Amino acid sequence: SPFVAAVWPGKALFPDMLNKEAREWFGNKYQFLLDQGVEGFWNDMNEPAIFYTEDRLKDVLEELDRFKGQNLDMDKYYEFNGLVRSLSNNTEDYKVFYHNMNGEKIRHDRVHNLFGYNMTRAAGEAFERLEPDKRILMFSRSSYIGMHRYGGIWQGDNKSWWSHILL
């Protein structure tokens, strides 16, 4: 069944980037933008990031109920805050997210870094197929060994500070 989790736009479905047919489907989605003359792309949040899942949100909201009407001292505040923060990128959520790779069911937490790699791969292979005579610019936030074949590596949310240039 599809894996549903929330990110920037709210609830979203995640393409199975380890599945060849899904990668081809995803890569073909670039056609519309290429037809508009777009020649540069930036894959973001493709770790993939998860803000929350419905199951985890339900559990956390139930736990937060016990704080209602309380005067939160520092310890209780940090406990409350920790519960809320536990929603985002919770490792338990990655354990219930599965991929289909060559007919084999694989748990996401075991191949986490391959998601971003294969997302960029899907785009790179699509660009070669859709625009074989053009070199399309592609940056990806998430990467893995060999990803440079398909796009450049973006180092994340850096600032224009000298100390960040050293990263």
PLM features per residue range, with description:
Residues 1-167:
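Catalytic-domain carbohydrate-binding cleft regions of carbohydrate-active enzymes
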